[in-house]
């Protein structure tokens, strides 16, 4: 089954007769009776620049339920984002409550790398493909591995045994206007380049 999906928000604004309708995202979703098999990867050792959650969330604006990074490590080739334990329960708790947070873990880890490498803040714009695989074990030691690619990122979330839980390919962002405060960028290891 292939479904065309849209996330649409409607809000009434003061002084306007008609509600404002915004399409936030569109996607084609392929549903299958057979879940994809979880891949397995070797876990690389990350020895780059470490960034603590308190420094990340001085820049990021997420509330407690989506402060998914416990810490991150960045180097020129990519980033690792370590999933935070003990997040508040989601309002729609159930079997699938972990997947949005794991996708967000990829987004935020890519953002940390972008702050480190380019000193810029960006929001999600487009993802070419997302694959989620069935969880066969409890969520422990989950890590997002983010690899910069031409014009974007590829990412995956793996557990401590190397099992792949989520894969994103072709993730691209759009830069937010304005500059990040230089004193906040210092924690990310950003070093401005001389023109």
Question: Which residues does each predicted region cover?
Answer:
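Acyl-thioester-processing domains in fatty-acid/polyketide/NRPS systems
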Residues: 1-195
């Amino acid at each position: 089954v292939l479904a065309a999906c849209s996330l649409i928000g409607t809000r009434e604004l003061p002084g306007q007769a008609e509600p404002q309708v915004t399409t936030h995202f569109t996607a084609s979703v392929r549903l299958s009776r057979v879940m994809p098999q979880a891949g397995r990867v070797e876990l690389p050792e990350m020895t780059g620049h470490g960034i603590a959650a308190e420094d990340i969330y001085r820049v990021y604006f997420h509330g407690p339920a989506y402060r998914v990074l416990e810490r991150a490590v960045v180097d020129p080739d990519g980033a690792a984002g370590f999933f935070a334990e003990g997040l508040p329960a989601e309002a729609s708790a159930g079997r699938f409550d972990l997947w949005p947070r794991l996708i967000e873990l990829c987004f935020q880890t890519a953002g940390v790398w972008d702050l480190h490498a380019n000193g810029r803040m960006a929001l999600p714009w487009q993802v070419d493909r997302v694959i989620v695989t069935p969880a066969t074990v409890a969520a422990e030691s989950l890590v997002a591995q983010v690899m910069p690619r031409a014009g974007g990122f590829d990412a995956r979330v793996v557990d401590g045994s190397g099992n792949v839980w989520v894969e994103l390919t072709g993730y691209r962002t759009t830069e937010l206007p304005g500059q990040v405060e230089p004193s906040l960028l210092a924690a990310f290891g950003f070093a401005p380049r001389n023109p």
